[in-house]
Amino acid sequence: VTVIFRRNEEIELNLCEFTGAIALDELKAVAKYQADKPDILGSDTFNLVRADADFSAITFSMLDQMFEHYRRLFMPLRLQIFRRAVWLCESDAPKAHVAYWLSQDAKENMSTTVKHCHSFAEAADWLLLTDAERGMVERCEGFVEIIRFQPEPARGL
């Protein structure tokens, strides 16, 4: 998997892009990174699940474990705001996993309100973005890559 975390300071929005085969270790690394950077947690996040994203190695039981992991990481932060996290899937394959994740109580456990949207327009409306800002998200314009999570390359013997 590759999980790419980007930020646009101008519109104060995080963009988290999921592509390829998703592994539990990368998801845990994303959670830890966010918990270690509370300054970025004050902003909304647009989670974009690319068409090639493959969650087949992740069971719902693993997602339950991840949610508990997030809860333990975020609970001590005691965020004073509710941030928004929108999810947009470019294909149907990961939608069951995203829907399961969003069925958890993120508001109480992570100070986050969440929504699964079906288009950039719907996501932008929910995040209260202007048309110009929506275009920036669609083109990844103004977003600077902060960190990339990907598996280590296999080493030869």
Model-based region annotation:
Residues V1-L157:
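Amphipathic, Lys/Arg-enriched alpha-helical "gate/interface" segment within cytosolic domains
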